[in-house]
């Protein structure tokens, strides 16, 4: 959901969630900023006013945002560390046009729908992966993860603000387990703060099971209702499932194991093959490009069904 907010000569448009809003709010109040809403959009904008372009070094979350400074006649754009939130842009006659979806850019007069040969080659060769910053359309770019950009009269200037560093691992096995547990719990519980109905996707795999475990424990420990969890299945999958080295058991075995032992309210969404086929084009349109076919259509149908009851879901998904 895109949020907007203005303060003085500054205007922000923002998509995402900041997980350390409380810490940022404390610092803002120390510096005589008044916070009038419960929105992280206000906190983000006023943090930018306080820290300038260095604000990205203080953010813990997933985000893509743009801030206009009408006094400086300057736009500041930034994307989160791992590129969870998308941000695309193009330049038309020295005018910066940006959006969370490529299709939105084409609504601006002068933005042409021309395929890029290099982008198409990557689509067929390594798709859905691609070279960071590129798309399948000419002159349509994505702001790379962990980058910010400044657009003013001198043009567009892009800079890397963070890079994952490799360090020698010196901790013992026990210390490693303790640290990993702490980091996972901290990360997951921070993301459980939501004004909207929240759930987790549960496939029975390691990632979704870990997320669901910590999230359900949080609900139980804080006297909240059981955590809603969702999984996907297919008509006649129980009859047609074939074991392999890659998948020796059906997902349902592990899903049932988790839901029986955790504080959850589980929902299973069952999809039929014709639905998958009928949704292939819709899934491609949603992505703005061809993707992983049946996987994308499954995810689209799954999310549409979950959206009937939920707004926010914690899940492990590949960044775009």
Q: Which residues are covered by each model-predicted region?
A:
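Cysteine-centered catalytic environments shared across enzyme families
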Residues: 1-286, 299, 303
